[in-house]
Each structure stands twice: as C-alpha cells, then as structure tokens.
Amino acid sequence: MKRATRATACVLMLAVLAVGAAGQTEERTVEDRLVTLAQQLRMGMTLATVAAYSPTLDDLRLHAQQLVNLLEGSNGKHFVRPAPPADDVPGLLVEMAWLGTRFDAALPDPESRARVGNAARNVRTFLTFALEAALTALDERRIDRASTDMLRTYAFLLAAYERPCDISYVPALWTLLRAFGVTEQLGADTPEGG
C-alpha cells in the first residue's frame, strides 16, 4: 500500500510539473495563465484528497508538503526541495498575486473589474486558508487530526475553484474564468449562474 501511495505521488507531481512547465514565461496571456492556475488548483485538490486518505502519517505529510510547495512556490517560506515539484515553480499564491495586478488592464468595463477584483481577493483568501490548513496538518502528530486538516485544506481549495453549490455562491476562480471567456478550455461545463 505504501509503495502504491508513493507511486501515485510521483505520477501526480509529474502532472503538476507538466502543467506548471506549460508556461512560466512572462509573455503568456492572462487567459492562458488563468487556465494553468485552474489546472494546478485541480491538482492541488487531488493532492489534498490523497493526503487526507493516506494510510500513514508519513504519507500524509509527503502529500501535504507537495501541496504546500504547489501553493507557495519554490521561493516560499515552507518550500521543501526534496518534495516535488523540485523545479522552480511560482506557486499558486504568487501566480494569483501576479494575475491580480493584470486584471484592471485586461478588463475595460468598471463593473467587470469590480466583480473580478472581488473574485481575485476571494481566490487569494481561500488559497491562504488552504496553505494554513496544510501547514497545520504537517505539524500534527495524530493521523486523524492531520486528515481532518487536509479535508479542510481540500474544502478551501474547492472554494477557490468556485464550483457553486445549491446553498451559497461565493465568486472565485470560475468568475475569473467566465470573465475572460476561457471555461471551455478546461473541458468542463460552466457552473450554474455563469
């Protein structure tokens, strides 16, 4: 079981690297970077799920650290080089901050800028909460508590991804994707209200 978990981790991180390497260059458009961010965020949700259901605390910590690396990037305070991705990556929080500086120029309409600004703040907040929960999981000594922290991490990542539920709607990443017309590139249906 332990070998299968580690093999899964390697496959997941190769996918993260492939998505991340798809464009670290400055010349990529806001739309392209949003699509990459969404793909990496989905990978983060997968890592959080794998961590939450890991059979051992060591396995959970491995996946939690991979997620911390994905969130913070290689220049992050909690980045650990031995845990994939080993290459330099900007991190979801850094990428979201960069994108936030480009939205006003990309959207001429004041109403769209306000909506996108709110969504961008929500995404950054949810990603920050996810990072805090993953770091808490790394410090836990009991697997049941660490698993709960990783489920909380998953919930924050899911909120950042913005798949609305029947009860409430909080604008986040899907609002950004709709604003830039790139939801089709993800091969997914647009959530209700989009």
Regions found by a protein language model. Give the residues of each.
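Bacterial N-terminal signal peptides that target proteins for export
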Residues: 1-10
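Bacterial N-terminal signal peptides
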Residues: 9-18
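Sec/Tat signal peptide C-region and signal peptidase I cleavage site
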Residues: 19-23
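Mature extracytoplasmic or organellar-lumen-exposed domains after removal of signal/transit peptides
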Residues: 25-194
